[in-house]
Amino acid sequence: MELVPKFLAGLILLTLCVGGCYAQHWSYGLRPGGKRNAENLIDSFQEIAKEADQLAEPQHFECTISQPRSPLRALKGALESLIEEETGQKKI
């Protein structure tokens, strides 16, 4: 019975080791890649702060899609012109 817990513990340990070996290394600047000097750490944080400020600025987007005229609006305009013609003919 002691064989199963030892085997299970070994399997979990092996899984963690393999996962750790394949993990991506993240540098000080929170960017994937190689190691960086601790001297450049402040520069990295300032770069991240600038990027965060750029994302915080509101972006204004303009709608470039023209809305088609409603068929009811066109029908209303046609009816108004017909009514004007009818009333204009009766007045003459």
From Swiss-Prot:
> What does the UniProt record say this protein does?
Stimulates the secretion of gonadotropins; it stimulates the secretion of both luteinizing and follicle-stimulating hormones.
The name this protein goes by in its record: Progonadoliberin-1
Q: Which residues form the signal peptide?
A: 1-23
Q: What is its main location?
A: secreted
In this UniProt entry, the residues modified to Pyrrolidone carboxylic acid are Q24
User: Which residues get modified to Glycine amide?
Assistant: G33
List localization entries.
Answer: Secreted
Answer whether the UniProt record assigns the keyword Signal to this protein.
yes
Entry's Gene Ontology molecular function annotations? gonadotropin hormone-releasing hormone activity; gonadotropin-releasing hormone receptor binding
**InterPro entries under this entry?**
GnRH (IPR002012), Gonadoliberin (IPR019792), Gonadoliberin_I_precursor (IPR004079)
What are the entry keywords? Answer: Amidation, Cleavage on pair of basic residues, Hormone, Pyrrolidone carboxylic acid, Secreted, Signal
The family annotation for this protein states: Belongs to the GnRH family.
Record-marked site positions (Appears to be essential for biological activity):
W26
The UniProt entry's GO CC annotations, sorted and at most eight, read: extracellular space
Question: Which branch of life, at top level?
Answer: Eukaryota
